Amino acid sequence: MKKIILEKSTLLTLLVTSGVFMGGTCVFAEEPVERFTLGEFVVTASRVATNKSDTPANISVITKESIADNNYSDAAEAISKIPGVNVLGSGAKGTSMGQDKILINGDERVLILVDGRRVNLGSSGNYSADWLPPVNAIERIEVLKGAGSALYGTDAVGGVINIITKKGSELESHVTVRAASGSWNTEQYGITAGGATENGLGIFVSASKDRRGNYSYKDIDGDVKTMPNSGFNTDGVNLKLDQQIGKDNRITMQFEHLNTEGGAPFGYYGITTTDKHKRLNNNLSMRYDWKESTDNSGYMQIYRNHHHAQFLSPDKDNKSDFIDSTWGVDLQQSFKLSEKNNLITGISYYKTEVNNDVMFDGKKEIDNQAIFLEDRWKFADSWQLNTGLRFDHHSTYGSELTPRISLNKKLNEDTNVYLSWGKVFKAPTVQDLYWKQNMPYEYNGVWYDSWTLGNPDLKPEKGNVWTLGTNTKISEKTNFTASVFYSDIKDAIAWKGNSNGAYQAFNVAKEKRRGMELSINHYFNDNLSGYLSYTYAKSERNDGYGYVNYDNIKPNIYRAGIKYKNEKLILNMDLNVVNGQVLMYTNGYDSYGYADKSYFTLDLGAQYKINKDAKVFIKGYNLTNARYQEYGGKYSNGEAKYPMPSRSFIVGMEYNF
């Protein structure tokens, strides 16, 4: 980006404009995490590199430059800035044994990939944002919003997030150290080293440590209190080796390690001060790519993901110790059939074993075999048609075909319009099928059973997802994107109370989701940029008695921000407004809700580059000191079950050797 002087009048204009837009019912927006350019290449939408203007999908990209400029603490913070993506945090790391849930377009059925390798758990089908690779190891993040089942399979109903990590062979030799400290005894440390040897072996290694004490939150009376038992301690190591073989072939080995433990304060009936959680993740993969710089590229990879989680409690009925282990193999080949026609095909197999005596009465297994193909046909100079088909054979539910059709029209070099339809198929998880656990509780001196039950008679979820969108470059300094989506799912799986008082998985008749995303990104000059965004999502389910709201998670999100950058200094301001949350809504037999209908947060960041190798930074979060929650749920007194942190700060530095 070029450099010129910050104009005070321009800054004031943006602030006033942001306030006007957020006061209405609709805002146009885009986060600075993605600047739309027609020449940008992405891989997640089609499993191979394609020009974004020829990609009929709603896809966002976070670059390593954006990660560095914003000094994100982790990948969860980075992806939470993307319109259409929600990361549901709890303030502590102890919700549901440490899971910060990721949603796309209001849907939690999201597939998470690391360098194209699936990492979702077989037990829950999810993957916590807390477990993603550290930001110092990330080259870029691609987010596909909309169904990806035809290419990626059963978990990709709401979308796909692909974390692409750095390769040592593509880096200059370096060592980078980072340290930060902040509120609630926060300490963050990271070190990365990478480069290539004389014989071309690429080496990249990163190590990180993140720990924090008990955090503070604002309660229902407006008082700031400390959440007991909410501290955590996390260590991680990532290693990636890659070696080019010949001109266009490459072999890559990768290892990811994560060890985390902390308090779990969020009990169903109140705050707990003794429950703890621990988790160990060890993932290993090997991949061979051939003809990687050609139109006839392909690869084969084998992998093993190992997760060991423990929930520790003085209450023996509330303990849990489980292992979730998946091994798999992927094979993919692309073909250039003609100048206007490309085909990609592949096979995939994975097997998951889950062992938990408390939750599943021992070991459970599922496996899935699949073959897929997609044809990309430019049938005219400005038209492209993508047609795809996937065949899955699930060990429990047999065979299923999932087609996808996408149409892209390039109106000119600065604008494209796309329409995409996909059939989705989502098999129940091990947790949905086999969970069986009793957690007795005491109320007024009387003990009651509290069962959580899976349902082996569940049907798979099936349905359709539609996306219509456009990307356009209004001017040399202004980019605009817009999209709408709609999904209808039959036999959607929901957890709710049954007639015997147990919490159980059921198929509901129908589920509908609809929403929109509007975004604008403007560059006032070569130093100053701004963005505005609005996203809307609504989820409804019909149990045979009419549609009712379901989840009601952040139905309206307004975001705005500005960024100033010159050779030495970077300043960021991010505004976030959520409204439309329901204080009380029903989900089958159960009631949920939020302590507040709306909230407003403000984050500020500053970075100063001391020299070419060193920088210092400071960030402030929730400077409005708002009371808010991202997971729904209230206690009987109206207090939020999962309050998010109050105002906090972090200060750090980074040095390159």
Show the residue positions of the predicted features.
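N-terminal Sec signal peptide and the immediately downstream disordered periplasmic leader
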Residues: 1-72, 76-82, 194-195, 235, ...
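Conserved C-terminal beta-signal and adjacent last beta-strands/turns
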Residues: 7-9, 28-29, 194-196, 206, ...
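Extracytoplasmic beta-strand/coil segments of soluble accessory domains associated
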Residues: 76, 80-117
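Short acidic/polar hinge/loop motifs at secondary-structure boundaries
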Residues: 101, 117-145
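A beta-strand signature from Gram-negative outer-membrane beta-barrel systems
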Residues: 135-176
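Periplasmic-side early beta-strands and strand-to-turn transitions of outer-membrane beta-barrels
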Residues: 150, 162, 170-172, 178-180, ...
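Outer-membrane beta-barrel signature, preferentially recognizing the C-terminal barrel domain
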Residues: 270-291, 322, 410, 414-416, ...
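Gram-negative outer-membrane beta-barrel transporters
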Residues: 343, 378-384, 481, 485-488, ...
